[in-house]
Amino acid sequence: VYKRQGVQDTTFTTLQFCYENHNEVPTVMHETLLKLFATYIVVGGMPDVVQTYVDTHDIGKVVRLQRNILELYRQDISKYSEGAEKVRIKAIFDSIASQLDDKNRRFILNRIDENGRMNRYENSFMWLSDAGVALPSYNVTEPQAPLQLNEKRNLFKLFMGDTGLLCASCMENIQFELLQGNMDVNMGSILENVFAQSIKSGGFSLNYFESKKYGELDFVIQNGLKIDLLEIKSGNDYQKHSALNKVSAVENWKFGRKIVFCKGNVEQKEEIEYFPWYMVMFYQREKEPEHYIYEVDLSDL
């Protein structure tokens, strides 16, 4: 998306160097990229929408096209599902934005069906996930590997597969606030969604951790054998992260990287790395060794 808007390869080279070496991004470049990131949130990644923006730079046209796509999604749900299943899928889809807007962002089934049972809705969530329309992030009992064995499948957040579509599904015209740089606490759900989208597209599974004792970590990511902790901060107080501090202090828990994505510039304080939001593009899977030779010594047999 950035390249489609004319960002040069030399800029990406500079950014990658800053990311890998914990160097500050030049101020003018940093401020411009924050604006481009806000544009990416609003426009999203749907090819036709991106092309419309590149051709016209008309946010009104972008939003109208996004709302047409949302309507096409609803038509697809009607076309490719039947009966009660169709009703459930539509109810889930239409509630994603409002559920994310809640304080803890967790998907609460009884908000769409007072007598609903998760086992009756499981296939509906799977339908939306398999279609790439929605991205579930599951809570874990503890932020340790292997995360898949620690998942609590009945506790999850449900993100929209494309953040531009999430913005378009919010009827308050928040696009203009975002483009003005007003990424305050009320935009936290939008910001968290774009990170879920980016992390998932990087090939990672989505998990989070929440407990009364430690608080909540936005993303707990299994990266190879290590567990990375990611916090997404929308405000100016991004160096306040009590849950991250508490979890990091648990003696028996071992972690890889501890990253805070924020509006600030690149910085490292002890073991916590601070990166601007737009640098999520450089957060990638650990490279696996090309060869791993293992042979048992049989000489003692």
Positions of the model-derived regions?
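Catalytic cores of nucleic-acid endonucleases
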Residues: S234-Y278
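Accessory nucleic acid-recognition modules appended to NTPase machines
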Residues: M46, V50-K226
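Short, small-residue-biased leader/transition segments that mark boundaries at the very start
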Residues: V1-Y2
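Short, glycine/charged-rich beta-strand-loop motifs at protein surfaces that mediate ligand recognition
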Residues: D184, L229-S234
